[in-house]
């Protein structure tokens, strides 16, 4: 038998095509009807057993309702490793037992999650039980509040958090995370020893958006310690330390890049706009913009840049350069005992700054500014 040339070529090409094709993906068994039904379930957890029950059953629920959950002392409300697409709803008042420990009180991780609060809810840390004026620097060991770690393509919105013992949100190892319309009210701590009650601490994360936050606290409203593509808008920050980059340096990740603060108000706070890099460390801060920022009754510094954070009496060091720093329409008031602007840069380590329509008044003019780059004034 003789095959014609066309047929031989066709067979050869077909064989080659089969050999060159990648192996098909492994086929896994589809979920059973029972598994699908479980994942479609709305699960409600409440009372003193609610936290442990939620932790045990969390992967069996597509919607988790936490209704008046009383988390036992020394226990984390563990919502880590949730199924993709899980919706968590805080309802009623969530409370926490007292114990000296480091926390966190709540921990969440997963992908495509939605974390919301029902109308009238509150997450009450009752921080006065720990407050002693020391914060994380000593005294009682205080639990951090909310670990938003290893979150991807997720949204946390509409939560009302009251009286955290110390830091509120720790955002770490997260990408494409949105925090929207969050209220943090630690105002009781103003006269009762609240300290280091940072609202949003961000590290080693990318594409984090915080919008519409209302914060009353006693430390940074936002502190970006490392990360890229961070956006904060429409914020109201009262009583704390302002909108901060850093402190940067001395960590495993010391790069801050492409951070924008826009359309926000800072009132009755120690600082307004703040960049702080730790003395004798390395890293970089670049592409940071503050636009349309209003300052009111700032107590210490309206705008402050320090490359000697940790030892401000020493000469600023150059290991963490600050480049492409933009201020656009930053204006407002400092109290008479405060300082309008302080810039403490190392030699040549602050460059490519662009300040436009910057007006901060009411306080003193600093005589301690060093190595102020062109494009800025002190």
Curated annotation (Swiss-Prot):
UniProt keyword Flavoprotein, yes or no: no
Signal sequence region: 1-20
SMART domains attached to this UniProt entry: PbH1
Residues bearing carbohydrate: 44, 46, 48, 52-53, 55, 57, 62-63, 73, 258
Broad class of the protein's primary localization: secreted
Annotated disulfide bonds: 43-61, 221-237, 345-350, 369-378
Protein name: Endopolygalacturonase I
Species annotation: Aspergillus aculeatus
